[in-house]
Amino acid sequence: MFNLLLVVVGGGIGAGIRHLTNMGALRLVGPNYPWGTMAINIVGSFAMGLFIAILARRGGSNEVRLFVATGIFGGFTTFSAFSLDFATLWERGATLPAFGYALASVIGAIIALFLGLWLARSLP
């Protein structure tokens, strides 16, 4: 139960940071392109890689990993978790599965979003 609390609290922090980042991007560059989301995905993926490498080198508790990686970075962007999964497959030498995962994840998510839109719009 404590591990779940770590993820929930970290996720709330990450989501708050994501919201503030999006609001800042809207003020800076306007709403014509999703700059905030793109920045969040790139920065979150970089931060996830940095954190995981430091954690692996210096060691760290499962609780710290859950709070920071799963919670904060997961709340900030799930794209960072996706990027870490891709990198893990790649570093294991599973190049084809890594690219299959990336392709299926991106295309599958976009198709699922459009299906959700279609379903919601077709309801009375």
Curated annotation (Swiss-Prot):
DNA-binding listed as a keyword: no
Residue spans crossing the bilayer: 1-21, 35-55, 66-86, 99-119
Topology term for the membrane: Multi-pass membrane protein
Main location: membrane
GO terms, biological process: cellular detoxification of fluoride
Binding site for Na(+): 74, 77
One CC-aspect GO term: plasma membrane
Keywords, comma-separated and alphabetical: Cell inner membrane, Cell membrane, Ion channel, Ion transport, Membrane, Metal-binding, Sodium, Transmembrane, Transmembrane helix, Transport
Location in or out of the cell: Cell inner membrane
Substrates-to-products reaction catalysed: fluoride(in) = fluoride(out)
Pfam families assigned: CRCB
The protein's role, per its UniProt record: Fluoride-specific ion channel. Important for reducing fluoride concentration in the cell, thus reducing its toxicity.
Protein name per UniProt: Fluoride-specific ion channel FluC
Species annotation: Mesorhizobium japonicum (strain LMG 29417 / CECT 9101 / MAFF 303099)
Lineage, opening ranks: Bacteria, Pseudomonadati, Pseudomonadota, Alphaproteobacteria, Hyphomicrobiales
